[in-house]
Amino acid sequence: MKLDVLRRYRAQLEEVLRMDLFILRQDLLDAEAISRQLDAHLRLTTDAYLAKAGEGVALDEFLVWQSMVAAETSKLAAARQVEGRLRKAWNQKQDELREAMQDRRKLDRLAERMRQQRHLVQHRVDQIEMDEAARRASMM
């Protein structure tokens, strides 16, 4: 496989990883916002229950409050799990992007070295041709 083809492939891979990372970041921001909303709602529900409990509540009303708090706690836990999975995926994608960028830089350095080597060889060939032309001219 030619080096230029490999370099283009690595650049495309890097761009795909950047797009994936952007999408994951957006999803993570959305998940964080949902978690914050659920947490705030749970706090409001808990505060309302505590205010109501200060006045005294019947058993059936207590059970209703308890089920509401349990449901909201469950939703919050699920949202935080989603947030954790997205954060882990985002960190992994960052690592993949970092690795792809390093690979591309290695290929870029290799291409530059090869270009310099070709330039050096061409310079030597030109010098040999000039020396040969000068030798012929001096012999005449």
Protein language model regions, located:
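Charge-rich amphipathic alpha-helical interaction elements
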Residues: 1-140
